[in-house]
């Protein structure tokens, strides 16, 4: 079946500077949707940047959500172009503060319901941030791990409790696939493990599997219908939005290279 995904006017992406709890200043891309009550934080992979999320960010913004995509410390516009940056081991766990600063930014703008989506270490960081913040309402984890540079997730998924979470991993990405399998068994709320084939790792899967962007968007928007018939979260409340069709059935979407 098809469920409507609401669409509304979005503002162009803007560059902002966020300050974390330890005083680190980081760059972030923001796509604001006017009067949005829902928002999403998007967190990139190691060696990548906020721009990896540009297409998904625009889609979410046009669907009525405000979006913040931070550059993690030592990444993106936080460092000179083509610089050879060595990130201290102790800084990896501190990167959860970038997620927290992004969540705070959205709440300060009036967003009431914040979700997080991350890829690879970004998935780990989102899960850890949500474990510490019971007001984060929803998660999407692309290629999560169990422990990367001290950013652990098994205890975090248990602390996350009964909130919704979407796991996505490709069978050819053995470590992430096994990690997601472990985490899925420990999740206690609404959950789905989307298994892809030959789709690679992290945000690369969004390029290699045409159905994935629609699944992620509908999960974050709360229009995804589980096989039980339940919706993942409340529908967006923008009464003046224009509907567009997005596939949101509870069946596994077909995977493509």
Can you name each region flagged by the protein language model?
Residues 199-209:
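Catalytic histidine-centered segment of alpha/beta-hydrolase-like enzymes
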Residues 10-32:
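N-terminal cap/lid segment of alpha/beta-hydrolase-fold proteins
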Residues 37-45:
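Short beta-strand element of the alpha/beta-hydrolase
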Residues 117-126:
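Gly/Ala-rich beta-loop-alpha elbow adjacent to hydrolase catalytic centers
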Residues 160-161, 166-169:
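Short beta-strand/loop motif that positions the catalytic acidic residue
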Residues 60-82:
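Conserved alpha/beta-hydrolase
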Residues 46-58, 179:
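The serine-hydrolase catalytic nucleophile loop
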Residues 86-109:
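Alpha/beta-hydrolase active-site loop
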């Amino acid at each position: 079946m098809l469920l409507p995904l609401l669409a509304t006017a979005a503002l162009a992406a803007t560059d902002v500077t966020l300050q974390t709890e330890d005083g680190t200043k980081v760059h972030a891309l923001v796509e604001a949707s006017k009067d949005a009550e829902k928002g999403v934080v998007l967190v990139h992979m190691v060696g990548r940047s906020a721009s990896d999320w540009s297409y998904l960010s625009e889609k979410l913004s046009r669907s009525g959500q405000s979006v913040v995509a931070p550059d993690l410390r030592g990444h993106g516009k936080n460092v000179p172009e083509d610089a050879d940056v060595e990130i201290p081991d102790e800084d990896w766990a501190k990167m959860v503060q970038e997620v927290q600063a992004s969540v705070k930014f959205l709440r300060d703008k009036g967003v009431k319901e914040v979700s997080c989506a991350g890829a690879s270490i970004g998935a780990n960081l989102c899960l850890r941030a949500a474990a510490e913040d019971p007001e984060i309402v929803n998660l999407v984890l692309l290629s999560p791990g169990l422990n990367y540079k001290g950013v652990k997730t098994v205890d975090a998924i248990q602390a996350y409790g009964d909130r919704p979470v979407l796991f996505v991993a490709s069978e050819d990405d053995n470590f992430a696939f096994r990690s997601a399998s472990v985490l899925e068994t420990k999740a206690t709320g609404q959950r789905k493990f989307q298994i892809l084939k030959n789709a690679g790792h992290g945000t690369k899967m969004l390029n290699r599997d045409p159905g994935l962007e629609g699944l992620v968007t509908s999960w974050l928007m709360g229009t995804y219908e589980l096989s039980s018939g339940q919706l993942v979260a409340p529908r967006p409340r923008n009464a003046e939005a224009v509907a567009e069709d997005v596939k949101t059935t509870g069946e596994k979407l077909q995977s493509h290279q």
